[in-house]
């Protein structure tokens, strides 16, 4: 395991796998209501903690901001400015998408 117990709801500004300073830091924003955003955040931390990636988490619950970006599902993960995950998908699918991204 790369970090301690990484399966938890990520806090605003928290960095997943922060000790991996040799890999780029990616910025992600989760758009949606607090409950679904928290579920996606926890699912993300569990699904990708073993991958060589660092993610800085931010949250945005503004419907206006989401609509302006073309977001259609709640919650949605925007990774480095691009819509990456829409909806509360399974952890295995999250892992697969990040493996392909890397």
Q: Predicted regions: what is each one?
A:
Residues 1-7:
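Helix-enriched interaction subdomains in cytosolic or periplasmic regions
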Residues 9-50:
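Local sequence-structure signature of Cys/Sec-based thiol-disulfide redox active-site neighborhoods
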Residues 32, 58, 86:
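Small/polar loops that bind or transfer phosphate-bearing groups
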Residues 39-43, 72, 89:
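Generic recognition of short, well-ordered alpha-helical segments
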Residues 41-44, 54, 93, 98:
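Non-catalytic interaction surface on structured domains
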Residues 53-65:
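Thiol-based oxidoreductase modules, predominantly thioredoxin-like and allied folds used
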Residues 70-77:
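Structural micro-motif
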Residues 80-102:
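Non-catalytic, surface beta->alpha helical segment in thiol-disulfide oxidoreductase systems
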């Amino acid at each position: 395991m790369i970090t301690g117990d990484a399966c938890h709801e990520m806090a605003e500004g928290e960095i997943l796998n922060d000790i991996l300073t040799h890999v780029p830091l990616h910025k992600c924003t989760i758009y949606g209501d607090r409950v679904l955003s928290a579920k996606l955040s926890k699912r993300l931390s569990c699904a990708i903690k073993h991958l060589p990636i660092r993610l800085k988490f931010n949250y945005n619950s503004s419907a206006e901001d989401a609509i302006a970006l073309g977001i259609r599902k709640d919650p949605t993960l925007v990774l480095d400015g691009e819509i990456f995950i829409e909806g509360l998908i399974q952890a295995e699918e999250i892992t697969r998408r990040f493996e392909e991204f890397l």
